[in-house]
Amino acid sequence: MESDKNSPEKNIIIPLFPLPTTVFYPNTSLPLHIFEPRYRTMVADTLKGEGKIGMILLKPGWESDYQGTPEIMTIGCAGEITRHSELPEGKYNILLSGLYRFRVLHEIKGKLYRQAQVECLKEINDRDLTTEPSPTKEQLSRIMRLYLKNLPEGTKIEQALDMGNCRKLAEFVDKLTHHFDLPVSKMQEFLEQQDVQKRANSLYSLIEFKNQLIKISKDMQGREVDFSMN
């Protein structure tokens, strides 16, 4: 049977691209402009090989050692280069398509850029959305649409989400998380959580809370508030 590249079964060695404010998820896309010499080399090598790069978040305090090997988080996301264009001076524009979560086992030296042996992580409590209705998906879809109605780009984001065509609950939840406004630390928490149902429950609570804040703000704007002490 043909293996699914989104369902890894073994440990692999991949190049690492650590960034301070970018958290990447499976089943999402990430455009990147590659200009640093070490990462230009990384992309060139990757295009000749497996085509995969591991995106991973830098830990706080990275600024003092950015050109070296600042500390990184343990959990990242592997992506495949699905489009690329080479620019003058060896720079690149690339598009990564997210594949799967991974855990760094240990880093491997010998290259200009960082690389590591990683453990490919499988999803826990995932659901097939093509075979039976999912109350979790329906509830998340409903409150996410309410949230998007209040955004200037909400219609465009909803079209990009393509919520009706997600085949797995993990894909659905990761796409929604990717498009929801969260601080980097919270996005990393979602990346590190392998249990899909727990991710879905947490995301539901966060979107519901944001919708409540939006409603309160609108109610306050819709009426004149008297702050007089008399």
Regions found by a protein language model. Name each.
Residues 1-230:
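N-terminal low-complexity, acidic/polar interaction/targeting segments
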